[in-house]
Amino acid sequence: PVQGLLERIDKGASRKFIIEQVKSPTDFFELDQKGDKVVIRGNNPVSIATGLNWYLKYYAGIQLSWNGMTAKLPATLPAVPRKERHETELNYRYDFNYCTHSYTMAFWDWERWEKEIDWMALHGINLPLAVVGTDVVWYNVLSKLGYSKEEINEFIAGPAFQGWWLMNNLEGWGGPNPDSWYKQREALQKRIVKRMNEYGIHPVLPGYSGMVPHNAKERLGLNVSDPGLWCGYRRPAFLQPTDP
């Protein structure tokens, strides 16, 4: 995946580097030189990508950012005069929260997500929250439980409000979402997770916290608690842990 990253940064750039992946008990990267090529060595693709970012910033004078993930590398790369090594004992480098997915990322397509995953790898992130498509799971589950399309749309929030929906704060606000939305989100999440796995990034997929639609007692006969309102919004109910 690092060769692909290099090609996305600057077409043809992968031919200027030697990428070496070796085993190590700790995450590390090394910069080295073999002839006219720069060597980036690490124990996994994220470590190697982090080493690439270090080289670009401190040797080539190139800084990549959210708004600029491409650059023109020099025809002859600055040499690494002596081997440089960096390692970390911080095994888990987390990224994102639920609000981020609604504030900033609600309408990202694959092109934008690809850049973000590259950016994660360049900065050593290996544990990002991956909640795209959670609404698809809810749609499918509620359908199997007998909820109608209209009822489901009253529960699932619109794209810009799903962070607060998934935090059990509101229902349905900003919806309903078209059928095409769910198809697109399912396909997008599969591409996101696939690319993360290629890098060795471990997506944090949401578990189940006990949230159910506010009418789950009447519709499904469940033992739930009514959490009331949040800032004037009707909140989902909570499934009681003693419910069989």
What role is predicted for each listed range?
Residues 1-90:
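Contiguous, structured surface segment used for ligand recognition
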Residues 21-25, 34-41, 45, 70-71, ...:
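Aromatic-lined carbohydrate-binding surfaces of glycoside hydrolases
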